[in-house]
Amino acid sequence: MTPKRALISLTSYHGPFYKDGAKTGVFVVEILRSFDTFEKHGFEVDFVSETGGFGWDEHYLPKSFIGGEDKMNFETKNSAFNKALARIKTANEVNASDYKIFFASAGHGALFDYPKAKNLQDIASKIYANGGVIAAICHGPLLFDGLIDIKTTRPLIEGKAITGFPLEGEIALGVDDILRSRKLTTVERVANKNGAKYLAPIHPWDDYSITDGKLVTGVNANSSYSTTIRAINALYS
């Protein structure tokens, strides 16, 4: 029997972002929880980034953000999570036909590379065209900017409903002015630009995720589990 396989994408960007000079990159909790959930539901999981590189968002590594089983999986060198992470592939090394689910994780690093990550977009569009699922969380839906539905040659999210990290959350984090000064976009703008309907959570930290056919999106790290479960359910719907 062919194993069920999911592909989790990471942002390749790891550079200064915050006002204190700290670097942004991958939000570790998002991928810890999604990886664990996929594994517990019988999926083999691989990681990919546009360049094959990645780095952690330095604001979200403290113990206050990582605890319990997440902390154990992150700190244990031979955990399934770290073994998979050590095998991370560049996007052009991936065969899209090997996977049923493409899961775009985030972190503010995604603001920099996802909208122009053509190879990741190509993988996602092929998985979707083959009847698979595209899921994205937090800033992950920025990957949809320029992502084309192979069958229609239109934006893949056109006419669909998506969610993702809201501007209200950027304001609460004190980074909205950074986005403006560096001309970085938001999930809501990407939705509007590509003909999708953006659905905002009541509060930016709510566990909120939605499904529209084979397209699944979630708002933040608190939505990692529900978004992953929705992606699995969408595959079999």
Curated annotation (Swiss-Prot):
Its EC number is 4.2.1.130. Keywords: Cytoplasm, Lyase, Stress response. It catalyses: methylglyoxal + H2O = (R)-lactate + H(+). It is found in: Cytoplasm, P-body. InterPro entries: Class_I_gatase-like (IPR029062), Prot/Nucl_acid_deglycase (IPR050325). Belongs to the peptidase C56 family. HSP31-like subfamily. This is Probable glutathione-independent glyoxalase HSP32. It comes from Saccharomyces cerevisiae (strain ATCC 204508 / S288c).
